From Swiss-Prot:
Cofactor: Cu(2+); Zn(2+)
MF term (GO), any: copper ion binding
One Pfam family it belongs to: Cu-oxidase_4
Superkingdom as given in the UniProt entry: Bacteria
InterPro entries, sorted: Cu_polyphenol_OxRdtase, Cu_polyphenol_OxRdtase_sf, Cytotoxic_necrot_fac-like_cat
EC id: 2.4.2.1, 3.5.4.4, 2.4.2.28
High-level lineage: Bacteria, Bacillati, Bacillota, Bacilli, Bacillales
Keywords: Copper, Hydrolase, Metal-binding, Oxidoreductase, Transferase, Zinc
Catalytic activity: adenosine + phosphate = alpha-D-ribose 1-phosphate + adenine; S-methyl-5'-thioadenosine + phosphate = 5-(methylsulfanyl)-alpha-D-ribose 1-phosphate + adenine; inosine + phosphate = alpha-D-ribose 1-phosphate + hypoxanthine; adenosine + H2O + H(+) = inosine + NH4(+)
Quaternary context: Homodimer.
Cited CDD domains: YfiH
Protein name: Purine nucleoside phosphorylase YlmD
Protein task: Purine nucleoside enzyme that catalyzes the phosphorolysis of adenosine and inosine nucleosides, yielding D-ribose 1-phosphate and the respective free bases, adenine and hypoxanthine. Also catalyzes the phosphorolysis of S-methyl-5'-thioadenosine into adenine and S-methyl-5-thio-alpha-D-ribose 1-phosphate. Also has adenosine deaminase activity.
Length: 278
């Protein structure tokens, strides 16, 4: 088994957060991971495990790919929930009544939402990615799991902080009980931005210099993973509560789709998290 800390490549199609794959004190088993591009039925340029219904792939192929992942964990795709991601910072709590939204038809997805969480078992949360940063959250004390989509816009709008805020203010979480994993995404070495983006980064309440490196006039390498880590720490999480994947979607063409590398015409990986009765 190949290990890509904090993920393990458990099948050609799935990277799993093994440290969370345990029963919590409320007798719920956490299933959390990130898909690769391999093992599905989609044809080029979406070959082969495309999970995005919004990229002009054949819907039937995407649904088959999603069903393949759902079946892997002995779940029904109708128990999964997807969102219409808009690069913002809206976080929504998901319950049993939301199951199936966006799973087979894009128009039924949760509207304009980039972060979702639940405290209910057998509700599986899913978001789609092709370079942006997947943020995974877990509070074993309150039995909360969540996932967020953080491109540069969602990052500067601090969607990670918004998730922590909702958990602490609405769900009674203590920041010291919240664990976060920052998943595979484009690395700083592969992600060049301009002053427009950096102006927004510099406005954040964390040090932009720790996440960016100027390479030329008005050109910067921006490490979105590190920026999200700094935001989460500023939100009350200790560094040891945050794990960061070193995997870069742009520089791993055998594993991942990349919007930037593939010039926009590509598939989507899926982040997923949920709890089953142990």
């Amino acid at each position: 088994m190949n290990t890509y800390h904090p993920f393990s490549l458990t099948t050609p199609s799935t990277l799993m957060i093994q440290d969370w794959a345990q029963t919590n004190q409320n007798n719920k088993e956490v299933i959390a991971g990130f898909t690769t591009k391999n093992g599905g039925v989609s044809q080029k340029p979406f070959e082969s495990l495309n999970t995005g219904l919004h990229v002009h792939d054949k819907d039937a192929d995407v649904v088959k790919n999603r069903e393949y992942i759902a079946d892997m964990f002995n779940t029904d795709l109708q128990s999964w929930v997807f969102a219409d991601q808009t690069h913002d910072n809206r976080v929504q709590k998901v319950t049993q009544r939301d199951r199936g939204k966006g799973a087979r038809e894009y128009h039924t997805a949760l509207k304009a939402t980039d972060g979702i969480y639940t405290n209910e078992k057998n509700v599986f949360l899913a978001l789609c990615f092709a370079d942006c940063v997947p943020l995974f959250f877990y509070d074993p004390v309150k039995s909360l799991v969540g996932v967020a989509h953080a491109g540069w816009k969602g990052t500067v709008k601090q969607i990670g902080r918004e998730m922590v805020k909702q958990w602490t203010e609405k769900e009674g979480s203590n920041p010291s009980d919240i664990y976060a994993v920052i998943g595979p995404s484009i690395s700083g070495a592969c992600y060049t931005v301009d002053d427009r983006v950096m102006d927004a980064v510099r406005a954040l309440p964390v040090s932009a210099d720790l996440a960016a490196n100027q390479t030329a006039k008005a050109q910067y390498q921006l490490d979105l993973k590190e920026l999200n880590r700094l935001i989460l720490m500023d939100s009350g999480l200790a560094s040891e509560q945050i794990s960061v994947s070193g995997l870069c979607t742009e520089s791993e063409p055998s594993l991942f789709y990349s919007h930037r590398r593939d010039q926009g015409k590509t598939g989507r990986m899926m982040s997923f998290i949920g709890m089953k009765e142990a």
